[in-house]
Amino acid sequence: TMYRFANLVSPEDLQAIASYLYLEMIKQGYTSVAEFHYVHHQPNGQPYSCASQLSQSIINAANITGINLTLLPVLYMTAGFDGQPLLEEQKRFGNSVARYIDIHNDAAQYCADESQHNVGIALHSLRAVPTEPMSEVINHFANNSSVCPIHVHIAEQTREVEHAIASLGKRPVEWLLENHAVDKQ
């Protein structure tokens, strides 16, 4: 399964996999990639000593192949609108707001000299990032860094829309537009 594979990948494996992918993309005419990066921690769920260790593997792959990269570290906190914890097999994906900000800032610093790279924000979804942490992340980056892309999955399936209505009282797009300044960023 996806989780089993994700829990086996080392930083070196990730760099090799991303390098191969990016080279294949370049061969097909792509010059840029937006990488939604979910896996942030060691297989046991503990952070690496360098917060952005796995992000750096992706940045290195982009440097090796020459593809332009927008790295989008994904914030993933809960398994549902009701705040259920992530599953055991998702432990490499989960972050607190503080740890997510560290990963983002460390990755941005790592590629600061690479003008063809950018680090944005990816909030997994309304169901996987509760409203307060979502606001905290958006406000932090609005106040403390240059303009960077912000991405959020609105809903992956109809059931998620139904859960949003039950939990937030609104459809996901409606809630997002009423609670955050959605713009070209």
Locations of the language-model features?
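Metal-associated gating/positioning segment near the N- to mid-region
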Residues: 1-46, 53
